[in-house]
């Protein structure tokens, strides 16, 4: 946590100066007034500036990345974590020369669990919610492509047999991929059935 004392003619001027010196934003600092400004005799002699002590709040993305890197180190994973940002999401991409299958887990379950923990760490303090997406060697895109192909294949089967086809249980995110992939098809419908970890998508011919 970075601390610094900064002075200015007024408290507000000191705050603005602190933001410039620390290269941050007003939302990411807290400050206490150490000394109030004094105008002095005739506004000149004996005047004293305002002095504030500024504390920069830890960046939630940096905090989450440090947590993830420490966790991966404990797992003996020699990998690199890179960050990409867009207006809606922060992407943490894990890459390395070793096999990342263990890190990804069956159907990405281990990766999803790590993503959940990383988001908890990033958002443990009050403030704007930050959504972090965790990926490893482009697994998410490859999995999405596989799910779309599966959805199209099973939709054809449902139409051919004129019977509903049930998919294996999936996470809410993966079920959404299936629903979205087939929503433009006019001759099939999709819906979810089951509870908890057994919840799955059903693809059925429209009646």
Curated annotation (Swiss-Prot):
Occurrences of domain KH (ranges): 58-136
One GO CC term, this protein: cytoplasm
UniProt key word Cell membrane: no
Keywords, sorted A to Z: Cell shape, Cell wall biogenesis/degradation, Chaperone, Cytoplasm, RNA-binding
Main location: cytoplasm
Single Gene Ontology MF annotation: RNA binding
Pfam family, one: R3H
Function: A probable RNA chaperone. Forms a complex with KhpA which binds to cellular RNA and controls its expression. Plays a role in peptidoglycan (PG) homeostasis and cell length regulation.
Homology family: Belongs to the KhpB RNA-binding protein family.
HAMAP family according to UniProt: KhpB (MF_00867)
Protein's UniProt name: RNA-binding protein KhpB
Recorded name of the encoding gene: khpB
């Amino acid at each position: 946590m970075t601390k610094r004392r900064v002075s200015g003619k007024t408290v507000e001027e000191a705050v603005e100066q602190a933001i410039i010196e620390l290269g941050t934003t007003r939302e990411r600092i807290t400050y206490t007034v150490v000394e109030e400004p004094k105008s002095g005799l005739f506004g000149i002699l004996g005047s004293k500036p305002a002095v504030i002590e500024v504390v920069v709040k830890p960046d939630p993305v940096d905090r989450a990345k440090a947590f993830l890197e420490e966790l991966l180190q404990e797992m003996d994973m020699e990998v690199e974590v890179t960050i990409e940002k867009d207006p809606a999401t922060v992407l943490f991409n894990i890459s390395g020369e070793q096999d990342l299958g263990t890190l990804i887990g069956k159907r990405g379950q281990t990766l999803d669990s790590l993503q959940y923990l990383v988001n908890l760490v990033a958002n443990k303090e009050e403030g704007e919610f930050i959504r972090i997406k965790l990926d490893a060697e482009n697994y998410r895109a490859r999995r999405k492509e596989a799910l779309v192909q599966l959805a199209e294949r099973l939709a054809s089967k449902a139409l051919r047999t004129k019977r509903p086809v049930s998919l294996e249980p999936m996470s809410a995110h993966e079920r959404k991929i299936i629903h979205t992939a087939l929503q433009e098809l006019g001759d099939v419908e999709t819906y979810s059935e089951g509870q908890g970890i057994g919840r799955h998508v059903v693809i059925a011919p429209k009646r």
